[in-house]
UniProtKB/Swiss-Prot annotation:
PANTHER family: 60S/50S RIBOSOMAL PROTEIN L6/L9 (PTHR11655), LARGE RIBOSOMAL SUBUNIT PROTEIN UL6M (PTHR11655:SF14)
Protein role: This protein binds to the 23S rRNA, and is important in its secondary structure. It is located near the subunit interface in the base of the L7/L12 stalk, and near the tRNA binding site of the peptidyltransferase center.
Keywords on record: Ribonucleoprotein, Ribosomal protein, RNA-binding, rRNA-binding
Family: Belongs to the universal ribosomal protein uL6 family.
Protein's name in the database: Large ribosomal subunit protein uL6
Pfam families referenced in this protein's UniProt entry, alphabetically: Ribosomal_L6
GO biological process: cytoplasmic translation
Organism per entry: Shewanella frigidimarina (strain NCIMB 400)
HAMAP family tied to this protein: Ribosomal_uL6_B
Database matches in Gene3D superfamilies: Ribosomal protein L6, alpha-beta domain (3.90.930.12)
SUPFAM superfamilies, A to Z: Ribosomal protein L6 (SSF56053)
Keyword Ribonucleoprotein: yes
Subunit structure, interactors included: Part of the 50S ribosomal subunit.
Amino acid sequence: MSRVAKAPVTVPAGVEVTLNEQTLTVKGSKGSLTRVINNAVNVVIEDAQVKFLPVDGVSNAWAQAGTARALVNNMVVGVSQGFVKKLKLVGVGYRAKIAGSDLDLTLGFSHPLVHKLPAGVTAECPSQTEIVLSGVDKQVVGQVAAEIRGYRPPEPYKGKGVRYDDEIVRRKEAKKK
């Protein structure tokens, strides 16, 4: 059995956590996030800690409590520090630039790709082959990074494509005659 739910979430200074029935709101210096907590979980907020207790008689209550604890911890980290995903474009002619709230990508297709950034995610391009995505919601930042990577995933023969900064692409040997 996982024991994630047994550890409380510590709320740092400058972050405010409020609970209204099953809706939990976390406010911090970078913004605010709201999430509805499952009914199988009781949430208790006391002395800068958020505790998650399973409801008796519900079969998967411990699992739901562990999930809620992990999600709320990500919310607290997001509004206090934020989340960052870095992408690299590897390939001849692969470029990225920012136009307002859009990301213009040239990835070897016959047409340029325009990716609209959702609210809460900001992008910057330190160079034409680097993209830095940042935001308060870990799920949204990761989803946007995965969508951009999905346009041209790294291929195993030459390693061309869009990859995460810390991603290691397993290379294959070319076919021998």
